[in-house]
């Protein structure tokens, strides 16, 4: 088979025009083309056909030093990357090349980053809770297998630690794998995350096959083409884990889904498309849908995604976050105010929510306890102005009791993490759902009104709180 060869005729930023002559066929849309710049392989992706013999492409790598006239080869297929267990413990870029300096990824399985979503007949309609072992999430905003969770939080409130604990707990409780896609990541953040994963044992350098995570990075300094496609590369690896060995439960993290949209907007502008509202690409909903619809459960396995979402100027009506909201099953909001109290994980129990917190799915007891906990916390929140101005003495006896219980609940929502053992010195706790419900049920019913507040801080189950209370006496 003769290779389809063209030549670069124009380079504008990250957009390249390639002309194919000598009766060669034009590459299909989304095909990957290859060219070499000082022995460095550069991958281009076909975005548009211009006339009879020219294609307009988006570059997946830096264009520095590339000139007109360079030969370009059509690979005959979209971008293909290595998938499977060989990717565990490794970092790769959008086109599947390793960027961790540990040699090639020797995988026999190579897969295209573009795939259709599973057929409706193959998708699972069951809504099962994915138990994370983290009390505040399991009780108040439970995750569902194959669901999509939005993780909202600013800098320094514990997003990374929460992500690493989820990776650790899901691997332990469900034996599943994790894929982390860094979309428009700061290089420093990506590097820190990698080393923290090594320190906490999520990545095992000595025996990479025992690692629990594969990483795909499209960093902030990469061209927009790479940042717009790296989430699809990560998702392709996640799909391979889901479908192997008759099904696995896979966790898929995207940080940050806003930067995926932002990169798509840059690509759209470079291709000369007329922008829509607020300057975003006209295909915003389509781009988001193509990614989100592939994140789903089949009859064999599931992909549960946790997506960090940046909200520009705190405007939830901005088209980028508003488009992603339509796809989410649960939101986990991290609060700086709660982090300042020293309560970790700093999940806001009143702002976080989940579609599966429904008596038909989680059961009547779980739903009832969760709503009672939120009611106590909401009452405490509304009383805080009175407490600040007049003090506790001005409250009725009933309100005083509510405040005491709310403060205990707040502290009981904290929990020591396995991945934080290195810097807290406290052993991490995985709490089963039944223990979580029983503990909070006892708290709202007043069974533990005689125990001091401090007994509930940074413990796992209610039994540990009772033991801690004995040592405090």
Curated annotation (Swiss-Prot):
Q: Which residues bind ATP?
A: 153-160
Regions annotated as coiled coil: none
The cross-references to CDD domains, in alphabetical order and at most eight, read: ATP-synt_F1_beta_C, ATP-synt_F1_beta_N, F1-ATPase_beta_CD
User: Where is this chain's protein located in or outside the cell?
Assistant: Cell inner membrane
Keywords for this entry?
ATP synthesis, ATP-binding, Cell inner membrane, Cell membrane, CF(1), Hydrogen ion transport, Ion transport, Membrane, Nucleotide-binding, Translocase, Transport
State the membrane topology: Peripheral membrane protein
UniProt GO molecular function:
ATP binding; ATP hydrolysis activity; proton-transporting ATP synthase activity, rotational mechanism
User: What Gene3D superfamilies does the database record attribute to this sequence?
Assistant: 2.40.10.170, Bovine Mitochondrial F1-atpase, Atp Synthase Beta Chain, Chain D, domain 3, P-loop containing nucleotide triphosphate hydrolases
Q: Which domain of life is it from?
A: Bacteria
User: Which N-terminal residues, if any, form the signal peptide?
Assistant: none
Q: What class of enzyme is it?
A: translocase
Q: What is its EC number?
A: 7.1.2.2
- Nucleotide-binding among keywords: yes
Keyword Cell membrane (UniProt)? yes
Q: Which reaction does it catalyse?
A: ATP + H2O + 4 H(+)(in) = ADP + phosphate + 5 H(+)(out)
A GO CC term? plasma membrane
List, alphabetically, the SMART domains matched: AAA
Q: What does this protein do?
A: Produces ATP from ADP in the presence of a proton gradient across the membrane. The catalytic sites are hosted primarily by the beta subunits.
Q: Which PANTHER family match?
A: ATP SYNTHASE, ATP SYNTHASE SUBUNIT BETA, MITOCHONDRIAL
**Family, as annotated:** Belongs to the ATPase alpha/beta chains family.
- Xref: NCBIfam families: atpD
* Protein name per the record: ATP synthase subunit beta
For this protein's source organism, the top of the classification is: Bacteria, Pseudomonadati, Pseudomonadota, Alphaproteobacteria, Rickettsiales
Gene it is expressed from: atpD
């Amino acid at each position: 088979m003769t290779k389809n060869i063209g030549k670069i005729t124009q380079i504008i930023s990250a957009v390249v025009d390639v002309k194919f002559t000598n009766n060669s066929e034009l590459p299909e849309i989304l095909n990957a083309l290859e060219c070499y710049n000082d022995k460095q392989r550069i991958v281009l992706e076909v975005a548009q056909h211009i006339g009879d013999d020219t294609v307009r492409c988006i570059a997946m790598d830096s264009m520095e030093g590339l000139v007109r006239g360079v030969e370009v080869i059509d690979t005959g297929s979209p971008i293909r990357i290595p998938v499977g267990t060989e990717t565990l413990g490794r970092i790769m870029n959008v086109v599947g090349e390793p960027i961790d300096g540990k040699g090639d990824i020797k995988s026999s399985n190579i897969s295209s980053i573009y795939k259709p979503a599973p057929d409706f007949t193959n998708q699972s309609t069951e809504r099962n809770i994915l138990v994370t072992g983290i009390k505040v999430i399991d009780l108040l905003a439970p995750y569902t297998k194959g669901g999509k969770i939005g993780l909202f939080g600013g800098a320094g409130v514990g997003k990374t630690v929460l992500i690493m604990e989820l990776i650790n707990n899901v691997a332990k409780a469900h034996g599943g794998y994790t894929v982390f896609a860094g979309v428009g990541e700061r290089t420093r953040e990506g590097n820190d995350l990698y080393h923290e994963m090594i320190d906490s044992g999520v990545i095992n350098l000595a025996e990479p096959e025992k690692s629990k995570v594969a990483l795909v990075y499209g960093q902030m300094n990469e061209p927009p083409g790479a940042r717009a496609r790296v989430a699809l590369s990560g998702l392709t690896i996640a799909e391979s884990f889901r479908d192997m060995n008759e099904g696995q439960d896979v966790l898929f993290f995207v940080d940050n889904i806003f930067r995926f949209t932002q990169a798509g907007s840059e690509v759209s502008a470079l291709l000369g498309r007329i922008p829509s509202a607020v300057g975003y690409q006209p295909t915003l909903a389509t781009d988001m849908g193509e990614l989100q619809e592939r994140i789903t459960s089949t009859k064999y396995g599931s992909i549960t995604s946790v997506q960090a979402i940046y909200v520009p100027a705190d405007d939830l009506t901005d088209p980028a976050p508003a488009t992603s909201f339509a796809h989410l099953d649960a939101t986990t909001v991290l609060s700086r105010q709660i982090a300042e109290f020293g309560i970790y994980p700093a999940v806001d129990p009143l702002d976080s929510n989940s579609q599966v917190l429904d008596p038909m799915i989680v059961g009547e007891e779980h739903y009832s306890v969760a709503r009672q906990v939120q009611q106590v916390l909401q009452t405490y929140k509304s009383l805080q102005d009175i407490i600040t101005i007049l003090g506790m003495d001005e409250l009725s006896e009933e309100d005083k009791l509510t405040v005491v219980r709310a403060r205990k609940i707040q502290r009981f929502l904290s929990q020591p993490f396995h991945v934080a053992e290195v810097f807290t010195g406290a052993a991490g706790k995985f709490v089963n759902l039944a223990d979580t419900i029983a503990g909070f049920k006892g708290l709202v019913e007043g069974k533990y009104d005689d125990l001091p507040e401090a007994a509930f801080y940074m413990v796992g189950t209610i039994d540990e709180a009772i033991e801690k209370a004995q040592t405090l006496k």
